[in-house]
């Protein structure tokens, strides 16, 4: 296909065999090497890892819960954000530490207000499906500058005003992403 003779390619192929990038087998020919580049192997593994394989349990609060209760949940669960759901359990919004801090700072009535007053509302919530790759999830986190994403599946309930409804099945965070990178770096 390249229009090159075998003797011309032989020295290049011999070098690739010595590096372990390809294997030479008599009567078979050349195949991908068993000592494939660790970086290439790691990136293939990362591209094939799905969110559902690494997601954590969601930390959920109802939209009628008070801001005070949300702050307590945030600290008790040791998370950076809470996923807010409606009475049917569908994604309603998300509330972060920053949201709570901005709302409560200097506001004496903040603790009794419902979280629905403070949260980022759906459809403005960035989320991910369980079947997306962790690379896609990481891109969303970086592009939208968020620390975590709710993992959602389409709800069996009807849409509200043309907006799809989502059931929350998990969450993926920067900590999970960092753990994935660390596991790859140390070869687990």
Predicted feature locations:
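Tandem CBS (Bateman) regulatory domains
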Residues: 34-56, 96-146, 160-188
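The C-terminal cap of the DNA-recognition helix in HTH/winged-HTH DNA-binding domains
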Residues: 18, 75-76, 142-143
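N-terminal helix-turn-helix
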Residues: 1-24
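Cytosolic beta-strand hydrophobic patch enriched in CBS
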Residues: 8, 61-62, 80-94, 127-129, ...
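ATP/adenylate-binding site constellation spanning eukaryotic-like Ser/Thr protein kinases
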Residues: 27, 76-79, 97, 174
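Amphipathic alpha-helical dimerization/coiled-coil segments
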Residues: 46-76
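Minor-groove-contacting beta-hairpin "wing" of winged helix-turn-helix DNA-binding domains
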Residues: 23, 28-35
């Amino acid at each position: 296909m390249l229009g090159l003779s075998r003797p011309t390619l032989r020295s290049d192929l011999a070098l690739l065999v010595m590096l372990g990038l390809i294997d030479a087998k008599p009567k078979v020919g050349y195949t991908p090497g068993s000592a494939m580049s660790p970086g290439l192997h790691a990136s293939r593994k990362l591209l094939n890892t799905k969110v559902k394989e690494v997601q954590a349990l969601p930390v959920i609060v109802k939209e009628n819960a008070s801001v005070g209760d949300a702050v307590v949940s945030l600290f008790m669960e040791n998370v950076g954000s809470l996923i807010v759901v409606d009475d049917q359990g569908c994604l309603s919004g998300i509330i972060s530490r920053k949201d709570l801090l901005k709302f409560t700072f200097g506001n004496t009535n903040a603790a009794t207000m419902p979280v629905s007053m403070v949260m980022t509302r759906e459809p403005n919530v960035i989320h991910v499906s369980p079947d997306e790759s962790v690379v896609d999830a990481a891109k969303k986190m970086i592009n939208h500058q968020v620390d975590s994403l709710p993992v959602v599946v389409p709800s069996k309930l009807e849409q509200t005003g043309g907006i799809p409804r989502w059931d929350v099945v998990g969450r993926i965070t920067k900590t999970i992403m960092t753990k994935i990178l660390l596991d790859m770096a140390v070869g687990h």
